[in-house]
């Protein structure tokens, strides 16, 4: 099972599209946790429309703002039970086959533990703008150690 965490803070204009795009996924085995970090823009009203949806495992409203997206992620991790976690940011949306394609790659190689994808920037009408770097690249496997050393660790010189 995949646990989908949707952390939200004041993204009411995009939130319905995000939640709908998650719930429309063709992959059959997932749960959704909706987290709201004290939004003041009507996000709660959008979220409440989904309260009784069978895929929604839990909805959590913070009493005060956590101050960090990472705090929301940690809260979501504690509430989920899936083998994999998808952090589906509230101002994005996904193609209906997104999760199915990611899981096919992860399932094809038991050594894979992380899927990373490219994204496309769109305007408020859904029209793409800007470039998608490396669009059309084939799926590839990376050695995690080399990735960490090259991209995440920096020497303090």
Model-derived segments and spans:
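Nucleotide-sugar donor-binding/catalytic module of glycosyltransferases
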Residues: 1-157
